[in-house]
Each structure stands twice: as C-alpha cells, then as structure tokens.
C-alpha cells in the first residue's frame, strides 16, 4: 500500500492570501509503462494556482516522466488529467499550450542567431506578415510585469546562461501559460542569478500562476516552495507543506530510510604536488580563446573545486589536461607520487622534474605511466558508448592492453556487477545497453569505472548532475576516498554549497581566466559568486586585492 500524507499548513499561504487556493491540475491514478518498466504507478497529485510546488524523488522515481505527460510529450497508459476541474486529453505540447501549460527544460532549445523576441515567437501560427515589433513590445511588457531583465533585440549567442533561461520562460508566458514546469532551473546559475530567478518566480506566484519545480537542491526547495511532493520508485509517497518539514524528513521520504546530509571534508595524511599548470591557453575551432593564461597547482590529497558560469572554460581545462584538446601555449606538468610522500613528516622535494602532458594524446599519456582518470560532462558522447552494455563499457580504457585475438570479459563483467551492487545502479543486468538507464545511473557507471582504474589524478565534471540526494552523497564519499588515498581530485561543480563543504580549495574561472583561488573553509558562496562574474586578478586566498 502506498504511503500518502498531506500535512496541514501552519499559517499557510491560503490564510495569507485570504482565499482558498484553487486546483490548477489534478492527476488521478496516472500510470505509465515502458515495456516491463513501470515509470509511474497510479499517481495522484494536485497542483494549485498561486503556489510553487517542488517535485522531489530519486533517479528513476518518475518525476520527469510524470511532468512530460502533463506537458504533452508522453501519454498516460492509465488515469485521468484534470485542468481547472475539467478532465482533458493531452496528446502533444500543442495541446498543453492550449490548456495554458508550458515546460521549461534544463537544456535550452534556442536558435543562436535569432534575437530573444524571434526565439519567443518562433513556431507561432499567424496570418500574413508577422509584426515582430509588436511581439517585442509584448515581450517587454511581460518582462516588466514579472521582473525579467532581457533585451528583446539581443542575439542568443551574446546572452549569458541566465538570459537564455529567461527567454525560455518568456516563450511559455508569451503563449499564455498559467501552469509552468521547470526542470532543474538553477543547475547552471550563479547564486546571484538564482536569487533573481526566485524573485521572478515569486512574482508569478503572486499573479496566480501554478509553478512546478523539479530539483535535487533541498536548500532551494526550503527557500522557495510552498509544498513539496515526493515520488519513490514510480509511486506517490505524499505531499507536505514546506513550513512543516525539513531537509532530513524530505530525504527520508525520498529514500525510505534515514540518510546523513553531512558532507565530510577529511584531512589527508599527506599532500604533494601532482599537477602544475602554467600559462595554459586554448582556442576553439573558430579561433576564440576558451582558456587564457591559466595557471594553478593541484596536489595529491586534496579536492580542488573548479567553479564558474557555464562556458567559462571548465570543460576546456579538463580536456586540455587529459590530452583531448590542443593547447596554443603553456604547459601541464605531471608529478608522480613520491615513494616517501606517505611517511609522516616527510617533505616531498620541490625540485622534481615533471612530465609534460601538453602535446600528448590520451594514449600517449597512459603509455608514459600517467594514471589519469577523466569523467567528462558529456556522459554518452565522450564517456560511454550508449549502444554497448556495462561490460563492454568497462573495457573501453583497457581493451588495447589485451594480447591475442580474444578479449577476456570475466574481469569487466565482475567489475560491472560490483559497481551495480556498491553504487546501487538500477538496471535489469550487466547486459543492458547503457542508453536504457536513467541519466543518474549512467553517471554512476561512468564514475565507478574511472575510480576503479586507481588513478593518481581524477578529473570529474559535474559528477552528481542529475543524481538524487542518496546517489550524490555516495559520489561525495567516493571522491573523499580517492583524496585520502593521495589522489589529486579536480572537481568541476555547479552547486556552490557542495563545493564549499567538500573542496579544500576552489579555483574560479571567468571568461577563460582564473579570477580567484580561495580556501573552501574560509570563503562564502557570495564571494565565489562575485569571482564567477568578475575577473579579480587571479589572486590566491589571503592575497586578494
């Protein structure tokens, strides 16, 4: 039997508004199957006008599938959807728009060479010539009403990530949406941009809009939402008022058991230089600088966080170190662990010769004995092969080392099964193609494989993106284990709260330059956020201008 509970508010929003909130959407017994997999199992859920509802759940719990049925991407196998008290049939996004429902996806769907106004009206039907000036005026009116800051005539390729997200939200508002669904809306925003977005969402709530947010960030749930609905393994667990709960209770509802929400930052026994980057400069295929004179050191026995607005050079930095991107200038020196570095009180000599990695391919880097692991941002494009099963994906880094015409699959099969057990990967078996796994489970496969290669340098980009709370904390634990083994961990992250708790130091990139390197124990989220939007001279912590 499903556990369902709804707690009454303590001085809730209905009382503050002086009226009883009206139901915007009601889901009754919604079920969706994909083959033998039941993604949603008889879900009942209500979304009210004039509220912000957060939707929580572990990976594979059915959150996105459920919202995709409301927005017309999927059609339910069983159950009913009621909008404004009337049962409706939603077979396409066009049907959803006609009912005032719009979904803003995490990955933007914009045309770079078009302006904001052109993207907003793109796809709308009309008779005769389209009045783009009138559309721009309407966009400006909506922006001023809710507090958006956007230039309707600005090209998308000149926009920041937050401006692009603004255009996506304006697209659904322009089409008359009263019910908005946002999937991980703060994933790539700075703290300051997040606060601006929250202010806009609160304005829309005050205007009577119904807003659903899919997120894994519990502190944002507590700060923004009125109620929280929780799914677990495709089933509806319950809805609680935010004022009556806390992150620990929400986590227990999601996972089904108590989970510690403390992120450890243990002190390693020793710390020695592992990477030294000097004046690293890279350009993209169009000749634009993606990295500009980047210099820093990374040490074994530490986690070095790398923060920055999306597109600030994080991806290019890791790829240049891994030999996947050519460098125009600069060097990357690798220093192997010193044989005596784990002896208490031993100081590793500073005059060691490093191995130059610039100019080497990933295969050449492996052949000179550099044990470097890389978890890329693009999981299925660069990290794994979607059509292969887990066993074959385990072999991608080592199959060239086998001699003879046949490849031994016993060891990679055992590794795949061990990762399933240790990381709680949800899959029918090791022979299932990874493209059939949820995004979070794909990430576990990739991170698990790289960590198992016993690296001395582990570079990972957004390792918990799309992961639920339980899985995220598992990954944090794995990164700390590597740190305590003397591995130099380079972690590109987007959640500053996590970086501040987990990392020993944080390197901040802005426009391809190092704008600051700060101590994770002595800085604040606001300070890091300012470095993300401002080049501050590349000062070390304690040496700021």
Give, region by region, the residue ranges found by the protein language model:
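Glycine-rich phosphate-binding loops of nucleotide-dependent enzymes
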Residues: 19-545
